[in-house]
Amino acid sequence: MQKPQSQILEKDSLRVLRIALDKLESGFDTLPPLTSASKDGAGLESVLLQVADRLRDNYPYFHPLYAGQMLKPPHPVARLAYALAMWINPNNHALDGGRASSQMEKEAVAEIARMVGWNEHLGHLCGGGTMANLEALWVAGQVHPGLTIVASEQAHYTHKRISAALGLQFESLACDKKGRLDVDVLKRRLDQRGIGTVVATVGTTAIGSVDPVPKILELRKQYGFRLHIDAAYGGYFGLIDNLAAEARGSYDRLSEADSIVIDPHKHGLQPYGCGCVLFRDPAVGRFYKH
């Protein structure tokens, strides 16, 4: 009996991609015809086969049954749509770089914003969590110039590096026994003044801990700091219904943050690289004018 093969991309999916490519091409059929840049089909095949052979030297993170890596494979539809878009290679830096894809980006970002309870927001997609956090902390520095940013010792290491790159003071604070930001330590530091932004991590990459957002929000009422939530890894876990009560309590309060980072290329099942930065107050767009 022949052993069934494990397929990365089903042949039927490739057939659908071919149909979609034909439809895409028909939208530009008024352009002058061009001959192929390379008529050497054998040469092209040789190069692609070499690439395919070298790509086999990877762990099978892409397989849906692989449980030894924190990231999940892209959804088949996302993978095909990504390939389809690469044929026109849009650039959403401005409408002239990608008119249709910019509109689709706005729709996707709005869906992510609604996931955390925001109907009104400002945000966009970017290359990943590092760039998204950089932008959020840059805005935080504009809102509270000269004030310090704090995060837990379990927060992603890039917060410290980002703060240094932006010329902002940064401090790491101790965690409790569950790896969460210790709110008693945070309160003592707030009493010393000079804190402009608190970074709460909802799903640390090392141990999956969730900072106590409700307790941090109570401190915000007293001290008036800006709350940025790094949910690059953990953001999509808010959709599941079997979270522990403490974790659910934090997810249910995400909408009260000033800014949030979520990575669709993690548990949003999108291809690399796809991060998302969101701001609750669209007025921070004033910092983008140039």
What is the predicted function of each stretch?
Residues 135-138, 160-165, 208-212, 237-243, ...:
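Short acidic, glycine/serine/threonine-rich loops at helix termini
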Residues 243-290:
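Active-site C-terminal subdomain of aminotransferase-like
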Residues 1-119:
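N-terminal entrance/gating region of PLP-dependent enzymes' catalytic architecture
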Residues 183-228:
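Active-site phosphate-binding strand-loop segment of PLP-dependent enzymes
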Residues 144-193:
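PLP-dependent aminotransferase-like
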Residues 97-101, 123-130, 151-153, 201:
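Active-site nucleophile and cofactor-binding loops and adjacent substrate-binding regions
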Residues 104-110, 121-145, 158, 162:
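Conserved beta-loop-alpha segment that forms the PLP phosphate-binding cup at the N-terminus of a helix
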